[in-house]
Amino acid sequence: MEEKHLAVQAGEVGEDGIPMLTVVVDGCWAKRSYRTNYSSLSGAAAIVGFRTKKVLYMAVRNRYCMVCSRAAAVNKLPGKHCCCKNWHGSSSSMEANIIQEGFQNSVAMYGVKYAKVIGDGDSNVYKTILDSRPYDELQVEKLECQNHLFRNFCLKLKDIVRDSKAGPITLRKCLGKNILRLRKSVISATAQLTKNEVNFDCCSILQKHILNAPYHVFGDHQNCVDSVCSIQRKNDTNWIPDLLQSGLLYRIMNVVNNLADNSKSLLFSANNNCVEQFHSIVAKFIGGKRVNFCLRRSYLARCSGAVISHNSGSFMTRVHKSMYNTRPGNFVKSTERRRENYLIRRKRKMSRPRCRKNLCF
């Protein structure tokens, strides 16, 4: 197991000699919910290694079996079949159950422990892991995905802007124009702290920067550090007294406090892009979630195929060799070779220095 060897080389081994891995977790479903209708018949979740970006564990939960359902509709016993129904709870609880199962089987499957987990902010999953206590002497530590932290931060500020009861329209418009500046100020402070070795003091320093960000952006520079505050910005209009008088500043600081509490995750600078990439392959295999593959075992087969495609990059060759014990023909080889060369060129292009957006605020 490559992820295990890399952890041993990095010295991430527990007192009992078992390697401690950092993993990324997330779930996906066979049906789009649009944040309102969580009623998918099937769902899957994956545990992906942080270093290798490969799927270490994947499982599927099904709430429906076509054979059993049709037999029950006519009050008959179903015939002999391989029933795919393995879940009786809600669709939203599938993800937590699968990830809990993966943590409990980590030692038996690979001889490793998942010490740190990177998630998308779903507290239910982490609570399920803690309640199950997969490792008696070790408490799993959670790190939040940086992308989700900033996305939720901006969405909550936009909700304040749209709320007519939050404060005067002039101040809410001022907040709406400066949401991106607030985000950039946090990113800039994080980037400066991560240039050197990150330690416990960096977390407290970053928290102070984040809590001071609204004051800096809205014109109050009393507590600003010269290294992150330009002289030109110090001549801005001070909106803080008006925000404080209207009560809007308190609502802004509630959102900022939530981001400051996750300063450790921001310094770790991790995201769950690797597991999102796996989910995109699953969506490709199931027709963009527009076709119902939840009647029998089709959804499980397609998710398993997505694991092969994600881990190996040569889905057709692996499946053909496993089924027929021979390598596929030249057409399949040339197709996969072109795909591999395309990915190499794309990675080489992405590694070149690019002109990025200015992070000055």
Would you name each region that the model predicts?
Residues 60-104:
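Active-site beta-loop-alpha junctions of metal-dependent nucleic acid enzymes
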Residues 32-34, 56-57, 126-128, 154-155, ...:
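Short helix/loop capping segments that flank catalytic or ligand/cofactor-binding pockets
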Residues 96-143, 147-150, 164-361:
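Acidic/histidine-rich catalytic cores and adjacent linkers
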Residues 22, 71-79, 251-255:
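Active-site-adjacent bridging/hinge elements
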